Amino acid sequence: MEHFAQIRALVSQVKSPHVRALLDAFLDDPELQPAFLKAPAAMRIHHAYLGGLCEHTLSVLQLGWRICDHYPQLDRDLITAGCLLHDFGKVRELSPEPGGGYTDEGRLVGHIVTTCQLVREKAAGIEGFPRELEWRITHLIAAHHGRREYGSPKEPVTLEAMVVHALDDLDSQMSAFALLFQAAEAGAAWTDRKNQYGRALAVAQPAGTDDRRFGGQGLYRREMD
């Protein structure tokens, strides 16, 4: 619940009443909220453990806020919306049960389309929600995989969409590397080269530790079967 409380704290600072109402509609949904707290962010590769989706979402959100401090031309409310919602549909795409795999909705529709549908549904329930704002938020979700060959129905065409894609990819790669470090033998300087990258990776050794494999912000958890 600590991660969820931190997400709430960031969302509470959204200035646009329409964006705030939309994000609250997701976070307050009695079906979506418990699923969001429990869901993994993936079946393998990154944040592949119970609660991984909430952890990944918070990390991307925190990165988004730091980026907005550095680049004031970014719309912080849109960045917050994109970072929070980009993977929200995974609550319906992935089974939270160990070994559960993909749901039928996940296989037939996928989390990007599911999230876009949820945005349309939630926005329709908010009086006076601007249609163009809905389109821009939907674009953040539709474009967050970056390229069509990676599953994005649209490629980023706004600054905010480019940033959400980049931060999602960065946080996913950090978790993926961490899981490979964990799988390495104790004291090993390199991972096995049989991984999704097709190459051995130099194992990071966090300051103040004797074991290269461990350290970081909860990233070294066991992935789901």
Annotate each PLM feature.
Residues 34-55, 99-103:
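Active-site flanking loop/helix segments enriched in acidic
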Residues 174-178, 183, 188-192, 206-210:
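Extended, charge-rich intrinsically disordered regulatory tails
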Residues 55, 66-184:
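Divalent metal-dependent catalytic cores for phosphoryl transfer on phosphate-bearing substrates
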Residues 201-225:
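Acidic, low-complexity intrinsically disordered tails
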Residues 20-26, 36-41, 95, 152-157, ...:
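Short coil/turn segments at secondary-structure boundaries
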Residues 1-36:
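Extended, charge-rich, solvent-exposed interface segments
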Residues 30-37, 88-94:
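Acidic-glycine-rich active-site phosphate/pyrophosphate-binding loop
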